[in-house]
Amino acid sequence: EQGRPIIERIRKTHPEYKILLTFFSPSGYEVRKNYQGVDYIFYLPIDTPRNARRFLDAAHPEIAIFVKYEFWLNLLRDLRRRKVRTYIVSAIFRRNSIFFRPYGGYWRQALESFDVMFVQNEESKKLLAGLGFDNVIVAGDTRFDRVAEIAAAAKHIDIIDRFKGDKRLFVAGSTW
């Protein structure tokens, strides 16, 4: 869902592009395996050098977009080697994450693969600037755009009204 606003914008502004959507987890794949907004939907292979190379040989991407916490080190390294424009959107960084640890050099190198990093907040931008990155733009969280879009299209459901009566109802999901 977090990448959906971007997919829809790309589809609208560049209808000639072929869009490949990948998932690593079965839960994400199962929810979106029939999504009509893209041309292809596949599982992403385990991130090994060989798998990254084979995947990119098959896909031939011109642009790669990662979302939030998606840092596939071998895939990123191969994208960079092939000079594929690569972006991350809705990324968020915290001071205690591996990128900012003394032993996080390999992970910091992965960040060099991104042409632009679109982060959620100023803190993330400052942390990355502290590592020497100036290709960072604060753009917020695409998830909020998607929630607003879903809320605007919400349908009235009689059974919910009957269930809650005149009381307020609070629903929480994916609350980890």
Spans of features found by a protein language model:
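A short helix/loop element that forms part of the nucleotide-sugar donor recognition site in Leloir-type
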Residues: 149-164
